Amino acid sequence: MNKLKFLIILFITFLFNLKYINSLKQCKISVLLSGDWSDMGYNYQMNNARIKAESALNLEMSLCYKNLEVSIDLAKQAIEDSIKKGANFIVISSSVHTSIGYEYARLHRDKDIYWLIRGRGRPVPDDLPKVAVINFNTHLLHYTLGLVSGYLTTSGTVGFISPGPQILALANSNSFYLGALASRKNVTFLNAYTGSWYNPEVAYKASQMLISNGADFIGMSQDDMSVQKALMDSGKMALGITGFSNRLIWGSDIALSYITDWSDVFIKYAGHILNDTWPEYTDYYTTLAEGGSLLFDTFSYRVPSEVQKLVSLEIEKLKNSSYQPFRCNPMYSQINLNFDSNGCANDMEFKNTKLLLKGTDISKTINLGLYTIPIEFVDYSNSMKLGLTIVSGFCILFCIISMVLVIMFRHAKIIKSASPIFCLLILFGCIIIFSGCIIFSLSPTDGICGARVWLLSIGYTIFLGSLLVKNWRIWLLFDNPKLKKRSITNWKLYPFVAGILAADVLILALWQGLGDIRSESRIGIDSLTKYQYANVCSSNDQGSVALYILLVFHGIKLLAACFISFKIKAVDIEEFNESKPIASSIYIITFCLFIVIPLMVSPQSVASQVITIVVCAIVTTLISISLLFGSKFYMMATQGLALNQTFATNTKSSSFSLSLEKQKSKSNGLEFEDSDESEEKLPQIKNYSNSEIPNLQHNHSRLAHFSSDSCTSAEQDSKLDLENQNDENEIENNQNNQNNIVEDCQKVEKLEKDENLEKDENLEKDENLEKDNENQSIIQKKRLSKNFNQSEIDPDDV
């Protein structure tokens, strides 16, 4: 029986506790912030209060929405999302969203949802019993900091930055001015607007404007410290006006900070919800009194002790809510405010005024209005432009000096072999390239966008085109297996250079005409802010296609240069062989392309792209001309000019062809065809006395001088000596390796004695050699060998 009674009592107790637990309300906080909770200011303090309340009351969770000032729609979405997630205590922390808070409070008035809304008064009509209004008395805080500014200013000018009358009335601006006026009677006050609670860039720039006008202390109604950062960046002391203890971050640079602690407010009203004791139609007024959510931090040691004492005395007075020097001042009659019986401006008129006080006889106020950041043009840095211009100018000077040297020493053997006129064309093309680099470093305009591509492209075309054509001639002369007489003058080569240049100009014209090449201003590129812009070159899709074709065209020229470099690598006369410089130049250009192309594709700033292109153009061009001409000038300096000397070779890597014709009526010796300085021709051989053509044992051909010594068939070796009878004739005997020219030649038929020959000698005849019985000159084909004597070529112009 006793057990039954005990169980009944236990069951009743359980039901009672269960009913009590169910009767307890839950509280889920949702805070709407105008800015970011990491601003170390007002939004940070609000979010910090949410966290403290959640911890103090053991709440399961709470919500926070940030950066809602950007859009009213975002604030509405945040409220709807909060209600959807079960929040029943919604805090509207910014006066920007006051009306939205009242709107949704009315929309959900029948629901068990409570509201804490920052505003300047209760809603009209006041039909929202579950709404508590925070009256944030910032005026006394700004008055105090204005007092500090008036004491500390050295310029006599202070300023204030606020969102503006369309967002926030000018009560804070007037309060700050009255505080500064209380400590300095002749103070000058500057006022400016940003149009927003949170716009760091505009606030910073507006502060710089006030500083440039003499302000050394600036108050503000902003959610971050951008204004004070501008002061500190200029070497001045700042004020802590965000509700956070800013000295914890910036130390002694902060003269004084006010602090807001909203945790007591959050805990108080959340407790009312949990205990079901919500006070209807209430207002919360912030004060400097104990528990009033407002207090001042400690002074910086840089603030004089006398100033600290004076300000501290004023703070003690302000703890009495009846002491309101920021509102009770006869100067408000300047802006037609009404006064109460205590001599203070009407509270609502004071809080809502959009007019700035006019100052006194010795103190003036200047309203600079809404500040907007001017759109700033950002050009390439002067150091970049100056550096690229100087380097390019030095390279142009190097090319000009090289051109002068080529002209002065055009008769030197090493310069003749390189064709002076084409050397000048190559250097001229390089000058155009370096000029294009200078243009490339300038700020883009419609003209510059086209000119820089034209100059670089035409410069490379003249440079590579001249190099290709002049070495193509070397290849043709040395690669002559049929021993044809070839006369390739400069005038025959000019059309090829002109043709390559014409193709380049045609592609460029298509690019210019179809591509809509222009300079346009863009914002938001690279590291630019939304208030900065830069000029960039642009084109349409057709222009891009034409540009790709142009790149392919230049790529083909590089491949052609590779091919010709390979074909002339066997030329054994050093003065003619430019295979190594050409190959090295191509390697360098290709290497730079492997650097440039990935960099151009990868994200990088426009300035970085310009630097990459220009530096690669300068490096490749400068190294190329250094390889081509540096070695020539060095040989001239170390080995002499070698004027009117012959070219010589004693290697076996090249073969030369010689056309021999019998001339019966002329004297013995070697005769060359007449030619101008730019013409290359093969020599012609006249009558030979007491000579025979030797047996070609090594399957090589060469150009040699025939002597009058007899040769026997037993020796099978002859010494050949060709005597030059015409010093004015100009030739270029250039041929490539020909191993198969004389493989079937074992013996050469004996030459019929000329009337001037003194004796005949018989040579062994090869069974496989055709006889020439018509007393004609026999074509001699010989290749140089290490075992043969040295050959000589007359060095006129090649």
UniProtKB/Swiss-Prot annotation:
Say if the entry is tagged with keyword Amino-acid biosynthesis. Answer: no
GO cellular component terms, A-Z: cell cortex; endoplasmic reticulum membrane; nuclear envelope; perinuclear region of cytoplasm; plasma membrane
Per UniProt, subcellular location reads as: Membrane; Cytoplasm, Cell cortex; Cytoplasm, Perinuclear region
Read off the InterPro entries from this record: GPCR_3_C, mGluR/GABA-B-like, Peripla_BP_I, PnrA-like
Phenotype of the disruptant? Cells have tip formation delayed by 3 to 4 hours and complete development with normally shaped fruiting bodies only after 26-27 hour. Cells are able to form normally shaped mature fruiting bodies, however with a lower number of produced spores.
Q: Where is the composition biased (Basic and acidic residues)?
A: 752-774
Q: Which domain of life is it from?
A: Eukaryota
Q: Name one GO biological process term.
A: G protein-coupled receptor signaling pathway
Which residues fall in a coiled-coil region? 714-771
Q: Which residues cross the membrane?
A: 389-409, 420-440, 448-468, 495-515, 546-566, 581-601, 610-630
Q: Extracellular topology: which positions?
A: 24-388, 441-447, 516-545, 602-609
Glycosylation positions in this chain: 186, 275, 320
Q: Which UniProt keywords apply?
A: Coiled coil, Cytoplasm, G-protein coupled receptor, Glycoprotein, Membrane, Receptor, Signal, Transducer, Transmembrane, Transmembrane helix
Q: Which GO terms describe its molecular function?
A: G protein-coupled receptor activity
| Bilayer topology term | Multi-pass membrane protein
The entry assigns this protein to a family as follows: In the N-terminal section; belongs to the BMP lipoprotein family. In the C-terminal section; belongs to the G-protein coupled receptor 3 family. GABA-B receptor subfamily.
Q: What is this protein called?
A: Metabotropic glutamate receptor-like protein A
What organism does the record attribute this protein to? Answer: Dictyostelium discoideum
Q: Which taxonomic lineage does the organism of this UniProt entry have?
A: Eukaryota, Amoebozoa, Evosea, Eumycetozoa, Dictyostelia
